[in-house]
Amino acid sequence: MLPMPQKSSSRPTVSTIARDLGISPATVSYALNDKPGVGAATRQRVLEHAREVGWTPHSGAQALRRGRSGNIGLVLVRDPEEVSREPFYASVTAGIESATSAHGYELLIRFVGGGEEHEIDVFRAWAHRRRVDGVVLLDLASDDHRPAVLEALGLDFAVLGHYEGPEDFVRVSTAEPEDAATVVEHVAALGYDGCLQVTGPLAYAHERRRLELLRRLCSEHGLAHAHERARYAISSGQDAVRRADVTFCSRPAVIASSDLIAVGALRAAAALGLRIPEEMGLVSWDDSLIAEVASPSITALAREPFAMGRSGGDLLVRRIEGTASRGERMQTAPARLVPRASTARP
């Protein structure tokens, strides 16, 4: 029987485990780090006792052994309060953290205002102080300078989402063409004769790509197309739909780039006296609990942002540790359409 662990308010260490078990710290260290020189029975005793006392590896010590900081960086050029209400980014960030922590890395998150230059300032500070081993990039622009800056700084990075540019870095690409086709085919099949597309800022490459795809697909399906821009916020989505000319077709469907924009579209439709789904349809490019509980509930694309973030975090760690080749690319699965009350036949 294992001796009872000594009660202590301090963090369990290799030395305290060795004292509890009556063996040397070196033996405990070899067992915990899966190194040779320890018998199977002893290794099992050490692992079981470590679990009992709640021992976890010290991230700082691990980083020193690896010659790295042990940190992954993520900079969001957004208002923190706005991000806190944005389910997509919360899910992506949780996915990144899930992957990086599984490899023993800490995720450092910074919020900055003022655009790309302020974000690059953070990257330079991190590189100068050796605070991070790599960076996850989100929301790339068509003429994004961040990859070149990170290359010059010697920081590994992974790109999440659509990007138009060199492909010699690791990335997780989204299935924008397939998702756009799913949306247009759905609204066309239900008798809507036009798409009012409300995108986020067109500085983002993925928003420009979605706009290009929907314009082409609407033309191919004989549907009218109109476009408005918004921020990823309910009030902005509401303003975008209210200022749109909704008479560009007889029965439009709003295609919103986020669930918050979609909720804003619901409010605008009510203010305009348009019945959803009878007179106006609504589809969100992002699914969430918000889309599910809205009234009426919102048809949406289930894109699994948590899995996307986890894939990106894992890919970056593998790049840092030399097990992912330069230019390695992962592709997210096409989204699954979740039909709800905001779209229906007339």
What are the functions of these language-model segments?
Residues 225, 246-346:
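Flexible loop/turn connectors
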Residues 118-131, 237-248:
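Short, well-structured alpha-helical segments in soluble
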Residues 55-121:
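Amphipathic helical "hinge" segments at domain boundaries
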Residues 79-91, 109-118, 172-182, 198-242, ...:
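Hinge/beta->alpha junction and helix N-cap segments in small-molecule ligand-binding domains
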Residues 1-70:
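N-terminal helix-turn-helix DNA-binding module of bacterial transcription factors
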Residues 27, 68-81, 186, 194-200:
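Short beta-strand segments enriched in small/hydrophobic residues
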